[in-house]
Regions:
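Non-catalytic cap/lid and distal C-terminal segments of serine-dependent acyl enzymes
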Residues: 5-289
Length: 289
C-alpha cells in the first residue's frame, strides 16, 4: 500500500493548534502537542498527546471524531502512521488522535500503566504492596477531566469517540465498555490481557451482559489475539471471544481476529488498522468501504 502524503489529500495528522500555549509542555513527538493534565480526581498527574487532522485549520466549521489511545507514548505514533494509510484507502474519516501518557523524563511507563489500566488487584509476590487495580479511578479521570478538556480545546465531535489499547491497554479498553457503556461508541482491543487476575474481566462481561445497560448500549467492539502469544494469554483471549459470542449482546457489533504468525506486541499494527476500519465503518460512505 503506498503511504499517504499531503498530495494525496488531507492524509496526515499535523501538530495540534495551540489554543492554550502557556500550558503546553515540550513536544516529545515532532508533530504532537503534549498537554499536561495535573491535579485530577485521583491525585495523579497525566499528559495527553494531541494530533490533529491536516484539514483542521482550513475547515473551522468541521468537528472530528476522536480516537483515545492508551500508552500514547508508544501507540500514538503507531496509530498516527496507520492513519495516513486509512485515509489513502478511504476506510476511515479524518479524526483527532489523543494519546494518554505520563509526565517526566524518566517515567516508569510499565509501572504506571499497570496501576492505571488494571481493574483488579492481582496477587503480589513476596507480600509486596499491590501495584494494580485502579482502572475505575483512571476511567473517572478520562470521563471527568480528559474528555471535557479535549472537547473544550479542540473541535471534537462528542457523538463519536473511540477507545483503543493493546495488552493492559486492551484490557482497560474492554473494562471501559462494561464499566461505563456509552462513554465511547467504539472499542479496539489489541491482544488484551483478559486473563489478568484470574479472569476478572470475564465476570465484568457476564454481569454487563445481564444488565439493563447491555440492552441499551450501541457500540462496535474489535478484539484481536496472536496465534504465537504465550499459550495462557492466547487461551484467555480465545475463551473471552467465545463468551462474547455466546452472550451476543444485541447492541454490540463485534469482530474478532487472530493475527497469524505474530507474537503479543506484533499484533498492534494489523489490529489497529483493522480495528479502526471496523470502528469507523458507520462514518464511511458505502462506496468508500
Amino acid at each position: 500500500v503506498p503511504p499517504a502524503s499531503p498530495s494525496a489529500g488531507a492524509g496526515l495528522l499535523r501538530s495540534a493548534a495551540q489554543p492554550d500555549a502557556g500550558a503546553i509542555a515540550r513536544h516529545i513527538f515532532v508533530d504532537a502537542e503534549e498537554r499536561p493534565i495535573p491535579g485530577v480526581t485521583n491525585g495523579r498527574d497525566y499528559v495527553i498527546y494531541a494530533f490533529l487532522p491536516e484539514s483542521y485549520e482550513a475547515h473551522p466549521e468541521r468537528r472530528y471524531p476522536v480516537v483515545y489511545v492508551c500508552d500514547g507514548y508508544w501507540d500514538g505514533p503507531l496509530i498516527r502512521t496507520i492513519y495516513g494509510n486509512l485515509l489513502y484507502d478511504k476506510t476511515a474519516p479524518e479524526f483527532i488522535l489523543i494519546g494518554f501518557g505520563y509526565p517526566g523524563e524518566h517515567a516508569d511507563y510499565g509501572k504506571l500503566r499497570r496501576w492505571d489500566y488494571t481493574p483488579a488487584v492481582d496477587a503480589v509476590p513476596d507480600g509486596g504492596a499491590p501495584d494494580t487495580g485502579h482502572a475505575a479511578e483512571f476511567l473517572d479521570v478520562i470521563e471527568q477531566t480528559i474528555i471535557p478538556r479535549v472537547e473544550r480545546a479542540y473541535r471534537a465531535d462528542p457523538s463519536y469517540r473511540v477507545l483503543a489499547g493493546s495488552s493492559f491497554g486492551g484490557l482497560f479498553t474492554l473494562y471501559a465498555l462494561f464499566a461505563k457503556p456509552g462513554l465511547f461508541q467504539a472499542y479496539v482491543a489489541a491482544s488484551p490481557s483478559v486473563g489478568f487476575a484470574n479472569d476478572w474481566l470475564f465476570h465484568d462481561e457476564a454481569e454487563f451482559a445481564r444488565s439493563a445497560a447491555a440492552r441499551a448500549v450501541h457500540a462496535r467492539v474489535f478484539v484481536s489475539g496472536a496465534d504465537h502469544e504465550r499459550p495462557a494469554s492466547f487461551g484467555a483471549i480465545q475463551r473471552f471471544n467465545a463468551q462474547m459470542r455466546a452472550h451476543a449482546t444485541p447492541g454490540i457489533q463485534y469482530q474478532y481476529r487472530i493475527v497469524d504468525g505474530e507474537h503479543h506486541a506484533g499484533t498492534k499494527g494489523e489490529s489497529y488498522s483493522r480495528g479502526l476500519r471496523f470502528a469507523f465503518a458507520p462514518l464511511v460512505s458505502p462506496e468508500k468501504k
